[in-house]
Amino acid sequence: MPLLTALMRPLGRALLCAVATLICLPALAAPPTLAQCHGIKDLAFVAHLDDDLLFMNPDIASNIEAGGCVRVVYLTASDAGEGETYMLGRERGVRAAYAYMAHKPDQWKSDVGTADGRHIARFTLQGNPRVQLWHMRLKDPWLGKGWGSLTPLSRTESEAGQTVDTLGPNPEVYTREQLIDTLAELIRQYGPTTVRHLDDTISVPYTQLCWRCAGHGHPDHIASARLVREAMVRAPGNYAETGYIDYPSQERATNLAEAEIATKSVIFQHYAWNDYHYCAGPTGCKEPAGPAAAWVQRAYYVSRQDIAPQLYPDGRGGLVVFAAGETNAAVNRWDSGQQRWQSLGGRTSGPLVSFTHADGTAGLMARDPLGGVWANKQRHDGTWQGWQALGGLRVTQIPAVAPRGEAAAVALGYDGLLHWIAPSGIDGSWSTWQDLPPLEGATGSPAVARGADGRYVIFASTTQGELFYTRQLPAAKGQRPEWHAWRRVPAPETAGGLAAIRNHENRVELYFRQRGSNHLTQLVEAGDTTDMDMDWSTAADLGVPFIGRPAINADAQGNVVLAVLERADGHLWLVEHGKPTRLDAEAASPPALNIIDGTLYIVARTAGGPQRYQVLSRRSGAWATAVTLEGVPATGGGPFATLAARPTDLPNLGSHGANNTVVVRPSTTDPSTLSVERMPTQVSRPATPTSVQ
């Protein structure tokens, strides 16, 4: 019996281990929920072991610090033709860096993940399993003498019929299509809130790229980003996208704060100690040095020239233009007597939103690369209070505001819900975000308008192409209004591009892009405008295809005016009284539109570089000669937090700052031309509180 017992013990242990494995594997394979990730699920794709540390930080480190989930996928083995030993050393380096970011011991669980039937090495941080590193390990030598040659990844991406195989255990061979399918499956499996990748926009052919040449990147960086963006098309979802400038960031100004640079440098050092091309170990290591020292001081984002500017009336018949900088990644305003742009700071990778506060002053919103929303308010003397965070929510896209300038906004959160926010006073303070009723499959491009009864109505489309609306309910005394459940709008399938406004008959007009044709389509509110159930006219196809969002406004009589861009670098169209007219102007971005003292303004980015904006204006039926705004600054960006206003400082912050804003207005001597001048102090007026019937 003792002998039998002794023989059974190993078998028992084996069975126990097998059972434990069966129990644990599904849990290990299942992606974490949004709740487990504290609302943040980052999925970063990079070519090499260190690209994320040099080009995507401090963003990744910030999300780990916030308790978010971070999964990084390294496409190549990063072996430089030196074999597994060098690859494994670099892998140890990134693990050390991520353990440091997570404030946990450098202890990892190693196993193999799968995507699209492919086996991929996977490491999970034991002290914080929200952090995972996946290694596809595509072989990565130069296929020639070095720069000016292809790599296996860039060759497979650019040449038909090529393949790339992997280094180390679990060998795999990929075609270009198989790489895209695998990346798409990784996106679908994880369900990210943000997909991060490198710069796909560099147009220099792979075989003409050179080390540290201006504007040049690495062929693997470019190839990886192009493959990821194609994978995103195959795996759409409610997630944000952020692309990162890599090598060329060294050509731009430092835009990280000193504390960010210090932290980013130490993180990179933990990697460099394990990469013998950088350091032999911690002792005597002087990294980051050389170009790495420049990269750790910067974080810049890919811009695609398709971001519409924002327009704001200055209160005296002039127009102020705001734009996100493609070079400085900051919020910018067209400036003064010097006729140039100046920066309002911040780091943003997307568009801006402008609106009007109840006291007649301008407001701005911007989205940071972590999904946070920041607001800024202008004073009557033209200075700005400073950026304040609209905390409690991370959003996939910039919020949408009502088109007549009201300071209220709706945005799609990382949680898949639409959320509402409005000012809580006239001093620049805001309420907390309010959850709207759930809408399955909601997309990130809602529209909002104010109905005839004074209450707001929000429109949203779903991934299935359906249109819905929700309206504010009457508010109890001292309470903010709630919203009724979403109701279907009878309409053809939509592909986004929503815009809504109240017209001269106090009826809401709704516009959207029709799925299939991409035509601008119009619906007009019918029936009793006080009824919570909104009736609609038959959909009218206006026959104009367009991209992005329509710019929408109304003249003094309430007649609705829209402007759209038919395609990238295509013609602008103006829609008045339901009739589209093609303008003699082309643009790279969708337009912005405003009507100020009878003058219609349309502003859009021109094609090509550098970043410039064309200002079209029409008064009394006559178009003025177009004005071009150029010279958007290359510097001035930085973290919003260092520019943020404390609530107690809001009335006084920056009150002695110089007024740098410039106004575009019709010339007093020649109405057929536009003048550019310094923005005067705004006319003060009593605040007009929102009235709700």
Summary of predicted features, one role per range:
Residues 1-16:
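Bacterial N-terminal signal peptides that target proteins for export
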Residues 14-26:
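Bacterial N-terminal signal peptides
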Residues 30-189, 261, 270:
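Active-site rim/loop-helix segments in enzyme catalytic domains that contact anionic ligands
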Residues 60-67, 73, 188, 233-234, ...:
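Short, surface-exposed basic-aromatic patches at helix termini and helix-loop junctions that form
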Residues 81-89, 204-219:
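Short, flexible/disordered intra-domain loops and linkers
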Residues 169, 190, 194, 214-217, ...:
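The feature marks non-catalytic terminal segments
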Residues 179, 183-205:
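Proline-aspartate-enriched helix->loop->beta-strand connector
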Residues 302-693:
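A structural motif
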